[in-house]
Regions:
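Membrane-interface transmembrane-helix boundary segments in multi-pass integral membrane proteins
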Residues: 32, 75, 189-224
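Juxtamembrane "helix-exit" motif on the non-cytosolic side of transmembrane helices
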Residues: 55-60, 122-131
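Alpha-helical transmembrane segments in multipass membrane proteins, preferentially the mid-helix core
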Residues: 147-163
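Alpha-helical transmembrane segments of multi-pass membrane proteins
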Residues: 42-59
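Non-cytosolic membrane-interface motifs at loop->transmembrane helix junctions
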Residues: 64-72, 103-105, 129-142, 165-168, ...
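Membrane-interface helix-boundary motifs at transmembrane edges
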Residues: 95-106, 159-166
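Membrane-interface loop-to-helix entry segments
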Residues: 77-80, 135-148, 208-212
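N-terminal membrane topogenic signal
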Residues: 24-40
Length: 240
């Protein structure tokens, strides 16, 4: 799986490097931004369909019905965040405004969410998983390729002049909303999507500490992302 991840990273790094060497400023061409957003939307949808098909197959083999298996999918931060990317990119692709259909800080938030999701998955959840075939393709798609492509798209086409340090705190709203819903759902369904939210196994105190740690991690990552946005905006504003 490490080799496959390296291939994906190399495939994304090449176009990013090319952009950095040629033009650091985001493209102002709405048609190109809309076209690439549409392609990203289609790819994200394909990755979601494949990953959902695989996940539903696993749960149904364990005896769960189709409806319950589909419902369980909605409990994963990965599925929900990838869905946000697909919907947002679809809206950009179909709007005459292009990226301007969203505020600049909202596009930064979407990029922050999906890239942080990929990082958390890689650090906390990917270890010990021996995937192959379509399972590996689906896993790489939603956890690595979509985050990388979204980062590239944001880098190339989104303006970054509205991104402020205060947004790092505001951006905590989505992960906190998800965590609250996941804990509430787990209380009634006796199922938690991630081990670090499993109250039944680790108790409320430990899960509270886990949530605080993750929240702090999200906030620090948010600050780092704001610094990146400001740095890119400064480079784009420099006369050439």
């Amino acid at each position: 799986m490490t080799d496959a991840i390296s291939i994906c990273v190399d495939a994304v790094a090449l176009p990013v490097t090319g952009v950095m060497m040629t033009n650091i400023a985001p493209s102002t061409s709405a048609p190109i931004a809309r076209l690439t957003a549409g392609l990203l939307c289609l790819f994200t949808c394909a990755a979601l369909i494949l990953q959902s098909y695989i996940s539903v197959g696993w749960t149904m083999r364990d005896g769960m019905g189709l409806a319950d298996s589909l419902w369980r999918l909605t409990g994963y931060f990965t599925i929900l965040t990838n869905s946000l990317i697909a919907i947002s990119m679809g809206m950009i692709a179909t709007s005459s405004k292009g990226p301007k259909v969203f505020p600049n800080h909202a596009l930064a938030a979407l990029t922050f969410y999906i890239t942080t999701m990929g990082l958390i998955y890689h650090l906390l959840l990917s270890g010990g998983r021996n995937l192959s075939g379509l399972s590996l393709v689906g896993d790489l798609g939603v956890h690595y390729v979509v985050p990388a492509l979204m980062l590239v798209w944001w880098f190339c086409f989104a303006n970054k002049d509205e991104v402020k340090f205060g947004h790092a705190a505001i951006w905590l709203a989505w992960p906190l909303l998800y965590t609250s819903a996941a804990l509430l759902r787990g209380r009634f369904e006796n199922w938690y999507p991630y081990f670090f939210l499993d109250v039944d196994k680790y108790g409320l105190v430990q899960i509270g500490l886990n949530v605080l740690g993750l929240g702090l991690g999200f906030f620090i990552m948010g600050l780092a992302f704001v610094v990146l946005a400001k740095a890119l905006n400064g480079l784009a504003a420099k006369p050439r």
